[in-house]
Each structure stands twice: as C-alpha cells, then as structure tokens.
C-alpha cells in the first residue's frame, strides 16, 4: 500500500531543519513518508551575451550544490534514518514547487518552518505562499524557528461555529490528536458570552464528531482584541499547537488580514500553527 507523504519545503537553514525534525516525528507516529523539496532561482542573464548557455551552467552548478547539501543533511540529521523519505529540487519559488508536489503526489500535509515575525509575514502574507495556505486541500503545519520538536499534547482549536458545511473539515485535526494522544480545547471567542441557537446546534454537532478524542469547550468573551485573547489562552493553558480554519470573515481573517497584527502572530516564536483546509 502506498503511504501518503508529508511535504517539507527545505532551504537547509536551522529553521527548516527544525521543521524537518518535527515532520520526522509526525511521520514516525503516523507511519508516513517524507518528501523534501528545495526550490532555487537561476539569475536571469542576457541572451545576446550567451545567457542561455550560462544559465544552464549556473543551474547545473546549483543542482550539484543542492545535492551536496542534501547528502550533508542526511549525515547531520540521523533522525532521517528512522523514516522513509525522498528529496527533489526544482527551479522556481517554494510555493511553485509546493503546488507541483500537491499535484504529483498523495500529500497528507505540508510542514514548513518560519523565521519569527519576518518569516510568518513571508509565509502568510507573501502573494504566493499565502495563497497556498488559503487554497490548498491539505493541512499546513507552520513551525516557528524556536519551537523545538513538539509532541503536541495540548491543542487549541479556534472556532466561530459558523459556516461549517462539512464536519469532515476537522478530520485531519482529529487524526492528529489521536496520533499524539492529545487533548483538544475548542475555543469560541465572542463579543458576548452567549451562543446563538445556530452556534449551539453546531457546537452539538462538533461534540458528536469529536467523540473519538479528548476535548473540551471554552467560551471566551473579548472585544476586538482577539490576538491578545488567543495569546493569553495559549500561555495560560500550555497549548502546544494552535489550529485555525482560513475562511473569509472569520477569526483567521481578523488575525491574518492585511491590516492586522500578523507580524506578531508567532507568539514569541514558540507556538506551531496548524491550518486546516476548507
């Protein structure tokens, strides 16, 4: 039986290697394979000065260097020996290669690293990669640079209980929590502490859907400062993983919209973020 793969974009930085180590941990527990991808861009040169030939030579040299870096990575990351993996490289942006891999392989999830506030800005607001997160049909796990390797014992799910057409959207999270024997805190942030009839009905449906894993419900009354409320909850309840659903006009857009506090989202670069596909 062909195993689904966990896709890991890697640039050989400490940040991406940390994300890789988290992906290895997940792959071992879920019995999955890893697919490592590296993207590179060849400098543009003028054709009239032999640019085509020069670009070919530069690309070949870059591929040789990347091949050497992959071999060095395998030697310096002994954890890789515990899982099946393959690696590939390609010319283009990282998001281009992610799209291609999602088309060509059976991908379970994407695991990617981020360099603090700058990195989360590049990942979530960059024109290409942000569109990957918003439109991909697999979960994306973002690992902050200083997060270390997590066992994800305590997971927080932010939910507004609205516009959820299919509860299967939560299945990747349930599988993740079941694998790590984790507890899920389902948090509803609201401007008041009362749920509407629609929200109560959806909460009951979610309750039934989550019966396989340990979970609890929490309603938090906040005004407009959702980011402080989430950060406080994470710190007070020792949350290892924050889970969100990217839909228009919900808390995800409040946090990641152009005019929001995106650059502070990493919460001191310690809390991984799981984004579920819609």
Please provide the spans of the model-predicted regions.
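Structural beta-alpha unit
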Residues: 1, 22, 75-110, 212-262, ...
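Local beta-strand N-terminus motif with an aromatic residue
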Residues: 3, 106-108, 129, 138, ...
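A short acidic, glycine-rich active-site loop
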Residues: 54-68
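Charged helix-capping and loop-helix junction motifs
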Residues: 125-128, 200-203, 257-262
């Amino acid at each position: 039986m062909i195993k689904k793969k966990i896709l890991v974009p890697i640039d050989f930085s400490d940040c991406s290697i940390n994300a890789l180590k988290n992906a290895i941990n997940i792959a071992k527990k879920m019995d999955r394979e890893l697919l490592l991808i590296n993207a590179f861009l060849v400098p543009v040169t003028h054709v009239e000065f032999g640019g085509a030939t020069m670009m070919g030579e530069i690309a070949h040299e870059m591929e040789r260097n990347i091949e050497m870096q992959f071999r060095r990575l395998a030697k310096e990351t002994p954890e890789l020996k515990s899982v099946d993996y393959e690696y590939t490289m390609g010319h283009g942006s990282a998001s281009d290669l992610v799209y291609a891999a999602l088309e060509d392989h059976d991908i379970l999830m994407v695991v990617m690293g981020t360099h603090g506030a700058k990195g989360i800005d590049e990942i979530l607001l960059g024109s290409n990669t942000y569109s990957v997160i918003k439109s991909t049909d697999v979960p994306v796990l973002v690992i902050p640079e200083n997060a270390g390797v997590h066992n994800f014992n305590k997971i927080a799910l932010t939910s507004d209980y609205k516009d959820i057409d299919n509860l299967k959207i939560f299945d990747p999270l349930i599988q993740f929590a079941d694998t790590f024997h984790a507890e899920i805190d389902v948090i509803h942030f609201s401007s008041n502490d009362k749920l509407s009839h629609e929200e109560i009905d959806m909460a009951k449906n979610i309750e039934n859907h989550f019966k396989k894993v340990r979970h609890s419900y929490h309603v938090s009354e906040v005004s407009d400062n959702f980011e402080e409320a989430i950060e406080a909850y994470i710190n007070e309840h020792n949350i290892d993983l924050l889970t969100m659903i990217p839909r228009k006009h919900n808390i995800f857009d409040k946090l990641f919209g152009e005019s929001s506090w995106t650059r502070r989202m990493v919460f001191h670069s310690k809390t991984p973020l799981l984004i579920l596909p819609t």
